[in-house]
């Protein structure tokens, strides 16, 4: 007598695991609840807020000058680009225009910061996938750029160099020469990183057709920066809505085709090359002149003036105790930060402290899209997708 086979109608439950918040590839304090069917991701649920510090509320209790250092500590990889947005928003409320030399210096260091960010993004992305060498090469170059930060502001990371009304101090001739020397050799270092990664079969297998974002999806989810341009949309605030001196500079917009992780990697590498071109133009075209606005109620007098003039001493004291009184109004200012569109919505009631400061961080929008980007991919691909999003939790959690 043949035994009848039993029919099983049981439904297998999906496996749920925690990714992070203490994971080397989480890029900070990301906690992901991953729902897996075998090794295939069915759902990725990001849990944020582990680095929340209440920055927007803290800014309301500070003067406009005292609020500036908070912006260094949001995206702590692209510090001066965040200062840039805040300084521009305060200047918009004050309705002042800064000297042309100060604008050149700002753009120069904004592009140095872009290279700093992209080197870390590409280097860490490579290390997450399994390539250690590009990470070490990237940090070797970042060290040189951080030295430029230190020489101009005294700090390697949290510079507080851009100020409402200009920059804190002028750059020296020796520093300009050293930046020239860096620009001359950095292209070759980029070639070495590309030689290691771009045509590497393993690198391509891990990135091509992974985390594909169509142009419409990128718009619907509010993506910006490389995440938007990688999907084929030409949107760069430096080109489309130029600020400072970007309209006077010649550089190419970088656009991808397929919207996958590999395209976004190529876009970041090419953006570093375009930043080199912008830095070179800034150094060659930079005019002489002041680096601060000539208004003692906005920009503090120099140390030498404070020691010689009682009026300058009074201005200095009043500026740093009471702060600058900004006319009532509101403004939204956005710049093309390395990770995307970084925006500051600033409201003034006519006092020396902001009434409201709302910060728009690009990483927040990008992290929202992680679920649809990771769905139906393997567990190992989640690390690749997080790396290509270039998430930093200082700006996401704020």
Swiss-Prot record:
GO molecular function terms listed in the Swiss-Prot or TrEMBL record: NAD binding; NADH dehydrogenase (ubiquinone) activity; quinone binding
Pfam families to which the protein is assigned, alphabetical: Complex1_49kDa (PF00346)
GO cellular component, one term: mitochondrion
Catalytic activity as recorded in UniProt: a ubiquinone + NADH + 5 H(+)(in) = a ubiquinol + NAD(+) + 4 H(+)(out)
Coiled-coil ranges (or none): none
InterPro entries from the UniProt entry: NADH_Q_OxRdtase_suD, NADH_UbQ_OxRdtase_49kDa_CS, NDH1_su_D/H, NiFe-Hase_large
GO annotation, biological process: mitochondrial electron transport, NADH to ubiquinone
Localization (cell): Mitochondrion
Top-rank taxon: Eukaryota
Top class in the EC scheme: translocase
Enzyme Commission no: 7.1.1.2
Principal subcellular localization: mitochondrion
PROSITE patterns: COMPLEX1_49K
Keywords of this entry: Electron transport, Mitochondrion, NAD, Oxidoreductase, Respiratory chain, Translocase, Transport, Ubiquinone
PANTHER family tied to this protein: NADH DEHYDROGENASE [UBIQUINONE] IRON-SULFUR PROTEIN 2, MITOCHONDRIAL, NADH-UBIQUINONE OXIDOREDUCTASE 49 KDA SUBUNIT
Described purpose of this protein according to its UniProt entry: Core subunit of the mitochondrial membrane respiratory chain NADH dehydrogenase (Complex I) that is believed to belong to the minimal assembly required for catalysis. Complex I functions in the transfer of electrons from NADH to the respiratory chain. The immediate electron acceptor for the enzyme is believed to be ubiquinone. Component of the iron-sulfur (IP) fragment of the enzyme. Component of the iron-sulfur (IP) fragment of the enzyme.
Family: Belongs to the complex I 49 kDa subunit family.
HAMAP family in UniProt: NDH1_NuoD (MF_01358)
Entry protein name: NADH-ubiquinone oxidoreductase 49 kDa subunit
């Amino acid at each position: 007598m043949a035994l009848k086979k039993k029919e099983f109608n049981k439904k297998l439950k999906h496996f749920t695991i925690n990714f992070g918040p203490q994971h080397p590839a989480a890029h900070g304090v990301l906690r992901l609840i991953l729902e897996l069917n075998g090794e295939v991701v069915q759902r990725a649920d990001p849990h944020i807020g582990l680095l929340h510090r209440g920055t927007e509320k803290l800014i309301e209790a500070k003067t406009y000058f005292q609020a500036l250092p908070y912006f260094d500590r949001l995206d702590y990889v692209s510090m001066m680009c965040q200062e840039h947005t805040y300084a521009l928003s305060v200047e918009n409320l004050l309705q002042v225009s800064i000297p042309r030399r100060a604008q050149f210096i700002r753009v120069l260091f904004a592009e140095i910061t872009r290279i700093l960010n992209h080197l870390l993004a590409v280097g860490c992305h490579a290390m997450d996938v399994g390539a250690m060498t590009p990470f070490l090469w990237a940090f070797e170059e970042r060290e040189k750029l951080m030295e430029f930060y230190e020489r101009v502001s005294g700090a390697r990371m949290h510079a507080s160099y851009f100020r409402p009304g200009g920059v804190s101090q002028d750059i020296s001739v020796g520093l300009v020469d050293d930046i020239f020397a860096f620009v001359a050799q950095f292209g070759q270092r980029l070639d070495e990183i590309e030689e290691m990664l771009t045509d590497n079969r393993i690198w391509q297998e891990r990135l091509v057709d992974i985390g594909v974002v169509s142009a419409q999806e990128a718009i619907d989810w509010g993506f910006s920066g490389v995440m938007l341009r990688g999907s084929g949309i030409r949107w760069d605030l430096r080109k489309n809505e130029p600020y400072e001196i970007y309209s006077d500079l010649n550089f190419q917009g970088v656009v991808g085709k397929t919207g996958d992780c590999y395209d976004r990697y190529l876009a970041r590498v090419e953006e570093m090359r375009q930043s080199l071109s912008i830095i070179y133009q800034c150094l060659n075209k930079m005019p002489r002149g002041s680096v601060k606005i000539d208004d003692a109620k906005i920009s503090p007098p120099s140390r030498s003036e404070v020691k010689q003039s009682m009026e300058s001493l009074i201005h200095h004291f009043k500026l740093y105790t009471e702060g600058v009184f900004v006319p009532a109004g509101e403004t939204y200012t956005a710049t093309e930060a390395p990770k995307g569109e970084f925006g500051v919505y600033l409201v003034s009631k006519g006092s020396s402290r902001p009434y409201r400061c709302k910060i728009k961080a690009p990483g927040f929008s990008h992290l929202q899209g992680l679920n649809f980007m990771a769905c139906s991919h393997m567990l190992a691909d989640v690390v690749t997708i997080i790396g290509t999003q270039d998430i930093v939790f200082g700006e996401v959690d704020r």
